[in-house]
């Protein structure tokens, strides 16, 4: 398959089979990703590989405030996480909103979670 075909026909998967991902496959993926563009090509990224279920559960919990905000903004007819138009949804309403499972459960269900970090002091932030 040509790259152009792959890009145009591959969907954005949000469901997981529960199938384990071998270290070899994971390292192959990360090695290939290493060649992707980065700010100024300075490679300021790091990846933490998480397989421990208790840590994946904690990552899911850390996502709860963002998931609640997303749902509250959608319910209010807003475009969630919009950087141009500030939200009119009150903090109390956001806190009382039930988060959507699709924004939190995937962290728990995946066989592995990759946490990507970038040192902004290293890369060139060309999108200022």
Model-identified regions with their sequence ranges:
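Short loop-to-beta-strand entry elements in the cores of soluble alpha/beta enzymes
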Residues: 40-52
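Specificity-determining recognition surfaces
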Residues: 1-31, 42-43
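Short secondary-structure junctions and interdomain/linker hinges
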Residues: 14, 36-40, 66, 70
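Short amphipathic alpha-helical surface micro-motifs
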Residues: 26-32, 94-99
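Short secondary-structure capping/turn segments at boundaries of alpha-helices and beta-strands
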Residues: 31-37, 46, 101-102
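Residues within well-ordered alpha-helical secondary structure of globular protein domains
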Residues: 9, 32-35, 61-65
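Glycine/small-residue-rich phosphate/adenosyl-binding loop
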Residues: 49-128
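Short secondary-structure boundary/capping segments
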Residues: 5, 39, 104-106
């Amino acid at each position: 398959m040509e790259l152009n075909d792959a890009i145009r026909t591959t969907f954005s998967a949000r469901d997981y089979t529960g199938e384990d991902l071998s270290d070899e496959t994971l390292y192959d993926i990360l090695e290939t990703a290493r060649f992707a563009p980065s700010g100024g090509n300075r490679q300021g990224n790091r990846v933490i590989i998480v397989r421990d279920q208790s840590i994946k559960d904690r990552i899911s919990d850390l996502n709860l405030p963002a998931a609640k905000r997303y749902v509250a903004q959608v319910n209010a007819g807003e475009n969630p996480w919009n950087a141009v138009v500030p939200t009119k949804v009150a903090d109390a309403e956001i806190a009382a909103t039930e988060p959507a499972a699709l924004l939190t459960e995937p962290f728990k269900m995946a066989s592995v979670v990759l946490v990507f970090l970038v040192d902004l002091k290293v890369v060139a932030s060309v999108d200022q």
